[in-house]
Amino acid sequence: KKYLWIDADAWVNSWESIELYIKGSENKKLAISTSADRSYGRVLRAEWFFGSFAKIKSQNYKHAKSSGFSEEISREVALKPHLNIGVFCLEEDAPHWKIWQKNLKKALSSGKIWGSEQIAMNIAIYSDKLEVEILPAYCNWTLIEGLRFDKKQNTFVEPYLPNHKIGIIHLAGKDNDNIRKNKNF
């Protein structure tokens, strides 16, 4: 038995992605996409001090630290691709469920709710070393301003070649608040 989760602010544009999530979750692997793609531009932020010295800022590091995880774990996940749990698939008896729950309890004990479930899963994969199948970004597309509509195929596609069909369009992130509120979108 498998569980496929799709956030309420996402919709299926191409069934191929659903098939990839189901196939990717075979053998107790987590099937999931990252929040990074060649179309997305910047994936890390840096606070430049002087010359070539900078403080790197990543979503994984920020959430791990604010959720009370150790400096070692926070650094371990800091530069890894951020896994977006807005869409994922997992077998019911996969070990991820218990480890995710353990990590989520730790994250929530800090009092930080926003992002806690996501960093808990990122730590389960990168620090606890659970099996993962990382799918292409078009399986959980969050760059709404990067959507391109292909009139020939009558569907949304990636902006760069090979212009693959977007599988799931996900209005995740604060940058998409206006789109979520737009009833004409």
Residue map of PLM features:
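Glycosyltransferase catalytic domains, chiefly GT-A lineage
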Residues: 1-185
